[in-house]
């Protein structure tokens, strides 16, 4: 295992989140690529969820949150968590598609095994998958090199930094 996908988060106001941040940063320091969702509490400043607020890890926001969609059972738009964090770190780091991504379902409500879902929890596995693809090509690449590759190949969307981070993930350029 080299990549850890974290498609969940907690609110900054909840209990003792220091241990969660410490745990993901320990994994990062051990060489794992940690990729976490920015959360769906935007669009206000300082709404990136924990552990996505960690300065070390890669935090993923929703590329297409400007379209009305159902997220966590409510109709919303402009929901992607935005920085800066309490430590004045600009987040998210990167954006990926988050609208209508097919994912597993328990089938109870829908009767289907897969259903479309939306949110930063759906965008995060896209980035994790791209990183896995890159590591398949270059197995010796470090987590820091992965983060730099994402940054250096991102498509700048000309949005505020606390909205887009480095921009949209660009898998094609990452491979070339």
PLM features: what roles do these ranges have?
Residues 65-71, 77-122:
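Catalytic-core environment of secreted peptidases
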Residues 57-59, 89, 93, 168:
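Conserved beta-strand scaffold positions in the cores of enzyme catalytic domains, especially
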Residues 1-56, 86-89, 108-124, 163:
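Substrate-binding/access-modulating region of protease and related hydrolase catalytic domains
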Residues 10-13, 40-44, 64-68, 85, ...:
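Solvent-exposed loop/turn segments at secondary-structure junctions
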Residues 2-4, 47, 98-164:
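Hydrolase catalytic cores
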Residues 50-68:
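Structural recognition of alpha->loop->beta junctions
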Residues 33-35, 59-60, 95, 102:
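Structural detector of well-ordered beta-strand residues that form the stable sheet scaffold
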Residues 12, 164-176:
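C-terminal domain-closing interface element
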